[in-house]
Regions:
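In a subset of proteins, long, contiguous C-terminal domains/tails are tracked
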Residues: 161, 227-228
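Active-site phosphate/pyrophosphate-binding segments
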Residues: 57-186
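Glycine-rich phosphate-binding loops that contact phosphosugars or nucleotide phosphates
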Residues: 1-110, 190-217, 221-226
Length: 228
């Protein structure tokens, strides 16, 4: 951010995100934005941290101490705050109706119950991990928001398991990425958006017939379950 001569000024808002509130690169970017006259809003977890103090405004995620290396708790709360900001802005600008805004907030409030439901699958996840823990490489694929989640999922897998992992946009799978997939490679396909579900399944089907048949079939069943 600092090295690309950012086009920001007094009419701009720069949002910086940091779990600890002490991240050196993020703090330097914050200082650069303020030097150019921009207003800075920080999203941090640690109260009274350097970034929080240096910002014009701050939203605390209140995730509590982050013990896990993968920082899943802090990441989830950061996303929640970003979604809430986006919804609030859309409402104030009249981009969504009051009913849509209310539905959005209702969905956010339902997240704890949905997380609890996912955690009920702990044994299934452990079973899958026991089958694939010795994979040489693991690839995550997804489209749009699923691609962003794939990037984060791949990062967390690397941090915790020390297994080589990369994430790719599902639509780009045939452009080079496919050359890295071989028998025994695990491909995790995310397909949570209804409008792009069939396209992602098409990617999965292509890899199924070409490479890791057993692995992809299993993941196909998971994806179909999500669809229904």
């Amino acid at each position: 951010f600092r090295y690309c001569d950012p086009i920001v000024g007094k009419d701009d808002l720069v949002i910086v995100i940091s779990q600890s509130g002490e991240t050196a690169d993020t703090k330097a970017a914050l200082e650069e934005a303020k030097a150019r006259g921009a207003r800075v809003l920080s999203i941090v977890n640690v109260v009274g941290s350097a970034i929080a103090k240096a910002s014009d405004d701050v939203i605390y995620t209140w995730a509590g101490p982050e013990i896990a290396v993968a920082t899943t708790k802090a990441y989830s709360t950061q996303l929640t705050v970003i979604y809430l900001i986006a919804a609030y802005m859309a409402d104030k600008l009249g981009k969504i109706s009051k009913e849509e805004y209310a539905d959005f907030i209702k969905e956010i409030e339902s997240l704890p119950d949905k997380v609890a439901e996912i955690l009920k699958s702990k044994e299934d996840v452990q079973y899958l991990a026991s089958k694939f823990y010795n994979c040489h490489s693991i690839f995550f694929i997804g489209r749009n928001l699923d691609y962003a989640v794939s990037l984060e999922g791949s990062l967390k897998l690397k941090e915790i398991s020390y297994i080589h992992s990369e994430a790719y946009a599902a639509g780009e799978l045939k452009h080079g990425t496919i050359s890295l997939i071989e028998d025994g490679t695990l491909v995790v396909a995310l397909a949570t958006g209804k409008n792009l579900f069939d396209k992602t399944v098409s990617n999965v089907t292509y890899v199924t017939y070409s490479y890791s048949v057993a692995v992809i079939r299993l993941l196909c069943c998971i994806i179909k379950g999500l669809r229904h």
